[in-house]
Regions:
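P-loop (Walker A) phosphate-binding loop of NTP-binding proteins
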Residues: 166-169, 179
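N-terminal accessory targeting/assembly segments
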Residues: 1-92
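Inter-motif core of Ras-like GTPase G domains
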Residues: 224-251, 262-271
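Canonical P-loop GTPase G-domain recognition
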Residues: 273-277, 282-325
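Conserved lysine of the Walker
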Residues: 173
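Charged, amphipathic alpha-helical linker segments immediately N-terminal to NTP-binding catalytic cores
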Residues: 89-142, 312
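Switch I (effector-binding) loop of TRAFAC-class P-loop GTPase G-domains
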Residues: 156-158, 179-210, 214-234, 257
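Pre-Walker A adenine-sensing motif
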Residues: 145-156
Length: 325
């Protein structure tokens, strides 16, 4: 399972009825190969092992949430609720152990029984297996839904420096990322919104940087975000090594300059551990704003200088392959 996409390899979560059908049909085949009490014991062991193993596999296929990078853990919490997921996995783990205990109990009782009694015991065991699995039917469904949601999370590398590009819509964020990364960027969707995440990459002095545009999250005031989106913004604070905030002083973006600067100030408060670099884009049209840098993505003016500045604002020491250890 990848550290950059910890949920990508999660297997499909079986439903309760699928597990029971699989276990009982294979048990029937196993029983046909033998006769008398041996057939009943074979059916018991086959069904019990399949159910116990498959339920346990549901649990062990998931990564340890506490061992995840903070970005992935917080984003997962925003999407599915980590505490709820832990409880659901705990219930399925209980079911796995319960089936295993029932199998051992009925196996011991069968050994002391005749063939007819063994058949009755096997039927009792199957009924109790079904009761246990059906008790976690809702948990299995919830885990399956969580798996489907989390597999679509963006492939972000917490070990690579990340520059979050923020600002209101139409200020030139995507154009900037496309220009400095030669348009080699990826698009992924947040599962809890209709929003897409744009990620570009570039290398500088042996270091690979991620440039991340988050439309729908960091392009509007905090009060317009819902609870889940606020949690996602919180997750991004763990990821960002610098924030590049673009403003458009020309007014062409459709948003007042005061509103743009208010959003900048809000992000400064949220991302207080990293540098927030304010850049006026479309400087060929207007520079009527107090900014750290001025550039025009359209003409290319000062784009390289802005990129150098935001990279320089990142406190990152590369682990060079030729360094002495």
């Amino acid at each position: 399972m990848s550290e950059t996409a910890p949920f990508e390899g999660l297997p499909t979560t079986p439903r309760a009825d699928e597990l029971l059908d699989k276990a009982f049909s294979r048990a029937a085949r196993a029983g046909r190969a033998k006769s008398g009490k041996e057939a009943q014991e074979s059916m018991l062991l086959t069904a019990g092992n399949i159910l116990s193993d498959n339920l346990r596999n549901v649990v062990t296929s998931w990564p340890d949430m506490d061992a995840l990078a903070p970005f992935h853990r917080d984003l997962a919490d925003a999407v599915v609720g980590v505490d709820d997921l832990r409880q659901q996995l705990s219930e399925v783990n209980w079911a796995s152990r319960q089936v295993g205990d029932l199998r051992k109990d009925y196996q011991g009782r069968m050994r002391r029984a005749d063939a007819e009694t063994a058949k009755k015991l096997r039927k009792q065991a199957f009924a109790r297996f079904a009761d246990v699995v059906e008790e976690v039917e809702g948990d299995l469904l919830a885990i399956g839904e969580a798996r489907d949601e989390l597999r679509t999370l963006p492939d972000i590398r917490p070990d690579e420096p990340a520059i979050v590009v923020a600002g209101y819509p139409n200020v030139g964020k995507t154009s900037f990322i496309n220009r400095v990364t030669n348009a080699r960027n990826e698009i992924a969707s947040y599962p809890f919104t209709t929003t897409e995440l744009h990620v570009g990459h570039l290398e500088r002095d042996y270091v690979r940087y991620q440039l991340i545009d988050t439309p729908g999250l960091l392009d509007r005031p905090a009060e317009e975000r819902n609870d889940i989106e606020r949690q996602a913004v919180s997750a991004l604070t763990h990821l960002a090594d610098a924030v590049l905030f673009l403003v458009d002083a020309s007014g062409e973006c459709g948003y007042p300059l005061d509103a743009q600067l208010d959003l900048r100030d809000d992000l400064r408060d949220r991302f207080r551990e990293v540098s927030v670099v304010t850049v006026c884009n479309k400087s060929d049209r207007s520079v009527d704003v107090d900014a750290d840098f001025f550039m025009s993505v359209e003409t290319g003016e000062n784009v390289d200088e802005v990129l150098d500045a935001v990279i320089g604002a990142i406190d990152h020491e590369p682990d060079l392959p030729f360094e002495e250890r």
